Amino acid sequence: MKRALIALALLAIAQQSFHRAEQDREIRYWLLDPSTHQFRISHDFTVTRVGQASVHSFVRKGSVVAPDATIIDLDTGKKLHTHVVTGKEVNALGYYPTPVDADSIAVQGDLEEPIAKDHSTRVRVEETYTDAAGYFEKDGELTWTRTLGRPLNYVTLPAGWMLTSVNTPATISLDDEGRVKLRFVNIRNDELSITIKGRRRTRP
């Protein structure tokens, strides 16, 4: 009986760890009005490195992150103190095996306490990016281009817009608010280069 309980406990831990890891596989984008060149991003990840006292969301070159970025500790529900740091400052922490560009930008969230041995912390990053080169409207048509690196990627068009073309296979549906949502699955080891185009829906 004791062995059975131990086995069940180990199975539960394994399933929980797998579930947490699975959630690292997806990212969600919500396109705002193309005249703003802005879109929102949300993604989760788990931090396991013993002694790590902060987490980072790295901003791609060419994008500008809004100051209202939030990082939430999903295990406690609390918002972390966030601030913008340079790649040089991140590299000095020694948390990541591959150094980032010293001139790059990241949003840093400070954990309430460093990661303890055999513990982990799950966080959610929510940000608004501005990318005039990658998201714009021309002649009444919006264009959004981006490389997607996660296995599962969701992109939602602004309210009132319909999809006219997409260069990569996607599952297309409507969300609860009637907005067009695209689901991209990437089973390769490299990134998907996505180009989405859309137009405003004509009113009857």
Which residues are covered by each model-predicted region?
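Surface-exposed, acidic/Ser/Thr-rich flexible loop segments
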Residues: 48, 52, 99-170
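Solvent-exposed beta-hairpin/edge-strand motifs
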Residues: 53-93, 145-169
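Extracellular adhesion/glycan-binding regions together with long Ser/Thr-
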Residues: 92-114, 175-191
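Sec-dependent N-terminal signal peptides
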Residues: 3-13
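Intrinsically disordered, low-complexity linkers and stems that provide flexible hinges
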Residues: 28-30, 87, 137-204
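Short amphipathic beta-strand and strand-loop transition segments with alternating hydrophobic
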Residues: 26-33, 84-99, 110-115, 171
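Hydrophobic residues positioned within well-ordered beta-strands of beta-sheet architectures
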Residues: 25-27, 39-43, 107, 123-125, ...
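Early extracytoplasmic/domain-onset interaction patches
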Residues: 17-59
